Amino acid sequence: MHQHPRSPAPAAPPSASRPGANRSDDRPNSPAFDPRVQLTRGLGIETEARSSGQTSSSRPAKEAISKLNQLVTNYHTKAALVILASRIDLTRSDDTPKINPKVNRWFAIDLEDIDALREQLRFWRINDVSEQPPPPLIIETYLDTKDLTNNQSLVALDEQGKRFDVLESLSRSSEAHAKGPVSSRSEDVILERWRVELGNTPNKALPADLGSILPKIYKQSIVTFRTLFTYSKLLPAWKLAKRNGRLHAHPALQIRYRILAGKPNPDDSRPDRLTTPLFDSSNKVVETYTFGTTESPVGYLSIQVTYRTSCEFRVDDSEALLSSRFMGADDEVFRPSLPSRESNLKAANSGVGSAPVEKRTVEDPDPSRAYGSLSTFHHVGPTTSASPISALRAARESGAASPSPPSSSSRKPVEVVKASPLGRAAVLANESSPGVARRSSISFPPFKAPPLSASPSLVDPPLGMSPRSGTMTRPQFPESKNMPPPSMAASARKSLPLPGASETTATSSNSASPRPTPIARYSSAFTHRRGRPSSGNINRIDDENSSGKTSATSSNPQPGSGLLAEATGTSADSIHADDENITEFLKMLDLRKDLLRTSNSASADVTARRTTATSAALTRFQRMRDSNAQLSESMSSSMLLQRSSTSSSKQLSGVPPMVAGTSISTASSPGKPISPHTPHTPAIPSRLSSNSIVDYGNERGREQPSSVGDYTPEGPTIPHRPSVVTVNAIDIPTSPGLPFPPYRRPSSAAPPPPPVATDDDEIFPFNLRSVSLGAEERSHNSLSALQRQHDLEGAKSNTQPTRREQRPPLASEDPSRRSSSTGHGTSPHKRTSLSGPTVAPSPSNNHVYQPRFSLCRGRGLSGGPHSLSSGSSSLARGAPSDLAERDHDRDVNASGSNSGTSTVEDRRAAGRRPSSGRNIPPPSQVEEDEPLLFAMSDFGASRRSFEEGRHGNHGRRL
């Protein structure tokens, strides 16, 4: 037992002369000091009273008496350590913290022994119980209000959460009982008072076998201290201490303690700070608990605690406390005479023989019914008027009479349906007072076509509906309708069979006035074929169609539009009728027979889902049709504009860029006119056409050496015809959006067209060519060969001016040669040199390009009337007028072209622009082109070297 031997005590005096023989006479006869009155409380550890005649002639040993003193001393000190360690951090009060603190292991509880507490308990540690027992150990825990500032107040909270000023309550109690000035201790709020006491047994001497009794006393004390250790952490003061430790509360809320010796002075007139009530309450202010008594040879050892039952304290602002006091006074003075809202809810929920149903009034709606639709007011509550338009409609129908504010007895209960996987359902019960009737409202949603997901079923009963939630039968009054969220698709709703005609036109038999026909109870899986209900107005369907309640894709009402939550009036004699409640329950069971048929509901669900999916797909593709058409037009326009900007940038700076010829695509094959019936209309040049051009380049290389010899001075007749003309390129037509009249595309099985139809002017009604041709469209002759050809052909050009202008086209002329002339536009300078409007513009293309354009058309075509031919512009820039005339004569002789007009060309020229070398332009056309002409002096001789360099570069790349 960790007891150290002590020297034997001196012989005890006779019992008659012991100073403790008359201890019972010195103590007052009070229940607090007499442990015998506590026999029914605590642990009940005590023994029977020994007979008064039992005496011991022998004295106990000195060592046994020392062990008894040690047991009593540790009983007091360990009780104080257990009590204070659970409420106060004693380690902070220790001035000299130790690395290896001393542990107190008495009574099988290990706690750190604090030196500061040892000093405060020194009087109980040095006392000798054999001579004089120690006084009672009093430990008080309290709150000190000295740390509060002037604008802070310590408040106590009652069971309802009301605040009361603690100092004010203590001051009133002190002034009522005090005869003198109030001491400073009135600022303390005592929370607990612990009492550890050694009670004296009268006429009791120490037994001779004291050493054998002490172990039994120690074991009994272990049980007491275990109980103390546990119960001390269940009292309200311990909870306050833990809450302050977590929240780092105000210093005024920190629990303090003080240790007193003896009992309070009974003559003190001041009231006890522990038992003073801080606020009015029906509960006890304090309670007392005794941990039992342990009998010892020197008396009864006992531990008792008196504690406050309410320790809810906090520090608040004084002004806020004063304001709350005024508000509390207003609540008491201006208390309404009508019953409260909570009492009405309890009365409405109370029912006999049914499950509890949660109901809410119109003034107290369910927050879960808040719906963020544009057609609602974004409010929480029953949608009596779902939109401003419906509110005006309802006001117009109800008349000019203003309704009176509803009283507490006429509130309309609102059924709140619990949330479910299918969504929240807002249910309006048609229960009202006898004098109040609710009119149906018609809503006009702002959108004509609601989304597909906003197509709920109208007749599914609420998921949490009680059998007695409604008063009317379902065929007569659709009392509740689902209000699913907008994300709920129509396919998630189950459909029911269509009702009979008698059910849809049913009226109430116990109502004096006819009621409007309710909304259809059943919903078909084909929601777009469901008929619109009537609400007593023959123009209801027309109004709904004009207001946007129906659409091409879905005729279901939009959530929040008010149609799902329309309420109809009820009569006074149908409220809270038990027989009608039973009837309603039976009707509901009859209507929901499909719950037992899972296959039918599953098939209906699949059908509804399939119908909705089909409708959604059709709607999506219908909307995509217009957008795709617009996208196609936009892409075509952008490609045409891009090619126009690209080709116009390659032209000369003096030519206007917005020429119709600059947007021609070169994807079409030669000899095939562009027709609006072309099956393929790519806006991007095709690589197939480019490949065909490259393939024909091989033939072009074989034909090139004979190009010089073809032009002889004897005449324009060409002796031989290239064999590659019979091969046609792959036809990849261009975009149909070109600014020329449509041409019919010839069939591939038809015979070859006449030479006139294969002319390039038929395909491209433009007579000019861009300056910047690609590398594959240029010839590869050297500059000396070009000059030699120019000299040979210029010698014969002066002798044929008249015959050049009037010679008709030869029937045997090579169409490829004629097409080559159209590949190059006439020079504006030559056009100005001709006198008279009847003179046709002569082709000015160089013969160098003839083999190339006899095969296929190049990518550099820009048939605008203001484009210049690269061949003519590169040789005739800056030349005098006689040289230009010689070039003009030479080109006519070489290409075999003349200014005559054939019969076929006359017919075709009526609907298109004039072609170079074929048709005589009208005077208006010549006059139109006059402001756009430019002088040849704008182009210097340096341009010729630039073209020569480009010829060389392109030749090397090929």
Swiss-Prot record:
Residues 50-59, 547-559, 833-848, 894-903 have a biased composition (Polar residues). Residues 1-62, 337-417, 430-576, 644-762, 790-958 are annotated as: Disordered. Residues 736-756 have a biased composition (Pro residues). Keywords: Autophagy, Cytoplasm, Protein transport, Transport. Residues 397-411, 501-514, 644-653, 864-881 have a biased composition (Low complexity). Transmembrane segments: none annotated. One of its GO terms (cellular component) is Atg1/ULK1 kinase complex. The keyword Transport applies. One of its GO terms (biological process) is mitophagy. It is found in: Cytoplasm; Preautophagosomal structure. InterPro entries: ATG13 (IPR040182), Atg13_N (IPR018731), HORMA_dom_sf (IPR036570). Signal peptide: none annotated. Residues 357-367, 883-892 have a biased composition (Basic and acidic residues). Disulfide bonds: none annotated. Its main location: cytoplasm. Interacts with atg1 to form the atg1-atg13 kinase complex. Activates the atg1 kinase in a nutritional condition dependent manner through the TOR pathway, leading to autophagy. Also involved in cytoplasm to vacuole transport (Cvt) and more specifically in Cvt vesicle formation. Seems to play a role in the switching machinery regulating the conversion between the Cvt pathway and autophagy. Finally, atg13 is also required for glycogen storage during stationary phase. Belongs to the ATG13 family. Fungi subfamily. This is Autophagy-related protein 13. It comes from Aspergillus niger (strain ATCC MYA-4892 / CBS 513.88 / FGSC A1513). The lineage of its organism: Eukaryota, Fungi, Dikarya, Ascomycota, Pezizomycotina. The gene is atg13.
